[in-house]
């Protein structure tokens, strides 16, 4: 809650004539911040970077008070946050560091011995590499779905029809699978 209060106070100081209602913005922050950070941790592999990118997404939202009447603020936030996260990965010369951090997080949450840890780490590195080769929209689809978003939430975030998400997701999964197998043909199971 400290982060929400600090961010909220800071944003109120920088507000212009037209600004967000502080209570409304605080509610949006509380509803979406934790989930957006979780999605970004999966993407970036580092909680500190995920917090930074999430805060940037909320700053961008706050600077656009017209979005109060948008009706799909959550979708706008998810799309903006994943776009920003993808940009961070692309611009960073430390992609490998992010991949290793993401694998460490996965390893911390999964029991197993050193060999299991090593295999999981390598698998995470491969998955992140293949995700970086996909079209941004395909990578976003897969990341949002793996984070547990529903088809409707994904549709809202990517501004597509909810009825299209299943087909788009199938195509993204197939593209991911094809690229993964092409790069790692001897791996038994995806």
Give names to the regions the model predicted:
Residues 79-100, 120, 182:
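Arg/Lys-rich amphipathic alpha helix in sigma70-family domain 2
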Residues 23, 27, 103-132:
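Acidic, proline/glycine-rich intrinsically disordered inter-domain spacer in sigma factors
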Residues 14-38, 48:
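A short, charge-rich alpha-helical start-of-domain segment used by transcription regulators
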Residues 52-59, 63, 71-83:
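Structural recognition of an alpha-helix C-terminal capping motif at a helix-to-coil junction
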Residues 1-9, 13-19, 24, 96-99, ...:
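C-terminal edge and immediately downstream basic/flexible tail or linker adjoining helix-turn-helix-like DNA-binding
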